[in-house]
Amino acid sequence: NPVPWEGITIRADEVVAACRQQTLYELFRVIYESAARQTGASFWLCKSMKNMLYAEGIESTGISPYYIYLYRDGRDVALSFKKAIVGEKHIYALAENWKKDQEAALRLKDRTAADHFFMLNYETLIASPEKVMRQLCDFLHLPYSDRVMDYYKSRESENTAVAGKMWANVTKPILKDNTKKFLRELSSEDIAIFESVAGDLLLQLGYSLCTPPDLL
């Protein structure tokens, strides 16, 4: 995260004293719970995609996480990474990475109780943000607030946006047309490569393919 937590003090001696086991997962739990207490929050969230790879370790600390699986058309994800300053750039590698991430998330879904796993489709979110956020709040047993839709006005969003071009959009309202950009900006060859690698996952998640089957 390019933006440090504000108004939160993390003392090493207090963190160590609060740990019930000597693991990185326990440090993770204690630090986030400390931050939540200091801000008066009843919930805390870590948005790292890598959490899905360490779910068993995280759960070994005694917490029972709610998992939010935000998924997007992988071809638009690939296009975004091709423009970013980080990450793979070749469409084959991007397709492989996206496929592995979705497979890992779906494996986690299979081993998680339905009331602790929320599938959130990106395209549905940007088309009907309030409806989807109300559904998410219901899932988390949290009251919905209209302030949710004002995220881009927060000081944290402003601080994040100036940290680099990758985060420029966090100071903008939801971009309702931010979908299917790959149709305009990826070549038909790149689309075919992506679909040959990850077409099965695209279909499983409800997306349609652009390339005729005999060309995959």
Name what the model sees in each region:
Residues K47-K50, G57-K82, F194:
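Conserved phosphate-donor/acceptor-positioning beta-strand/loop module used by diverse small-molecule
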Residues K50-L53, D73-V77, A84, T124-A127, ...:
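Short, solvent-exposed loop/turn segments at secondary-structure junctions
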Residues L45-K47, Y69, M119-N121, V148-Y152:
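Short beta-strand segments
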Residues G57-G62, M119-Y144, V170-P173, F194:
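PAPS/PAP-binding and catalytic site of the sulfotransferase fold
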Residues I68, D76-K100:
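A glycine- and Lys/Arg-enriched "phosphate-lid" helix/loop adjacent to the NTP-binding pocket
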Residues D13-V16, Q21-Q22, K82-I85, Q102, ...:
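PAPS-dependent sulfotransferases, especially Golgi type II membrane carbohydrate sulfotransferases
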Residues N1-C46, L175:
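PAPS-dependent sulfation machinery
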Residues P65, D115-F117:
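Short, conserved active-site loop motifs that form the nucleotide-linked donor/cofactor pocket
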